Design a protein with these regions (language model features):
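Glycine-rich/acidic phosphate-handling loop/turn and adjacent ATP-lid/helix
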Residues: 90-122, 149-151
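Conserved short strand/loop->alpha-helix "switch" segment adjacent to the catalytic nucleotide/phosphoryl-transfer site
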Residues: 15, 40-62
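Short beta-to-alpha transition helix within the HATPase_c
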Residues: 3-7, 18-35
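Conserved ATP-binding N-box helix of the HATPase_c
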Residues: 55-78, 130
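Heptad-repeat coiled-coil segments of the DHp/HisKA dimerization-phosphoacceptor module
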Residues: 43-49, 89, 100-102, 139
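Conserved glycine-/histidine-rich ATP-lid loop and adjacent helix of the Bergerat-fold HATPase_c
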Residues: 123-133
Length: 152
């Protein structure tokens, strides 16, 4: 009986992706949105409690990245759309990488003119640049990839 209760309680606890509550909250919201849209959602976050970016700006970046991924995956025309988010530290940088299914005809190359970017990408880039961060966006073979890095 107790084992069954523990399993039930564990299944009702909100997913905890990392030590950072802002990141946890954003990922939980988009995990639920992806599930509602029948999009597989995977997230691995090794973010620390404190990040080099304010909570407000972290939400602006991460929510825009994952919101774009949600729309891209929904429009991908694949039978099994997916979104994968990885947050980790490498070479004294905090890195956010988001990959999602996208329409196979979508082309997005690193040297693409900024005039062709949408509002979400402009917001991601301007917020990242505020912290000396860098961004890279690509789309190849039905996969869109957004990478944002900040000095930690």
């Amino acid at each position: 009986y107790l084992e069954k209760q523990n399993v039930e309680m564990d299944s009702q606890r909100p997913q905890r992706f990392c030590e950072n509550e802002t990141i946890n909250n954003v990922l939980r919201v988009y995990e639920a949105k992806a599930k509602a849209a029948n999009i597989r959602f995977n997230a691995n976050a090794a973010a620390r409690k404190e990040t080099p970016v304010s909570s407000h700006d972290l939400v602006a970046i991460l929510a825009n990245v994952v919101e774009n991924a949600l729309h891209g995956a929904a429009d991908s025309e694949t039978s099994e759309p997916v979104i994968s988010v990885d947050i980790y530290y490498k070479a004294k940088k905090m890195v956010i990488v988001c990959e999602n299914s996208c329409h196979p005809s979508l082309e997005f190359v690193p040297d693409m003119s900024r005039e062709l970017w949408g509002v979400g990408i402009h917001s991601i880039v301007s917020t990242a640049e505020k912290y000396g961060g860098t961004c890279r966006f690509t789309a190849q073979n039905g996969v869109f990839k957004a990478t944002v890095a900040f000095t930690s």
